[in-house]
Amino acid sequence: MNLNEKRRDVARDICRSYGITLSVDALHAFADILEPFKVLKGHRLVDEGQVCNYTYYVERGLVLQYYRKNNVSVTEHISHEGDMVICIESFFLREPSKIVVAMLEPSVVFGI
């Protein structure tokens, strides 16, 4: 399967999971903006202090979102296949993130 076909499959999966129906042209336009990331265990998609530039769709793997409080890591959320991941305040306000987005295992995610 080539990258364009993969992007279309992922776009369909996202739309299906949220009950969204798109025309073929709109689905292809959506697929065109999906950016694939193959990442290793421990990789950080977003680090504390970085601005979150994507909403991520988890195609394969596990993603941990956490923050630090009094030098202790506090789990905010764990996401898996089919989930969306975002540091919402950072993404929309364009401010440095207080949340870290890290991979718990080798993963494939698509940035939107």
Question: Which residues does each PLM region occupy?
Answer:
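Cytosolic regulatory regions built on CNB/CRP/Popeye-like sensor folds
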Residues: 1-112
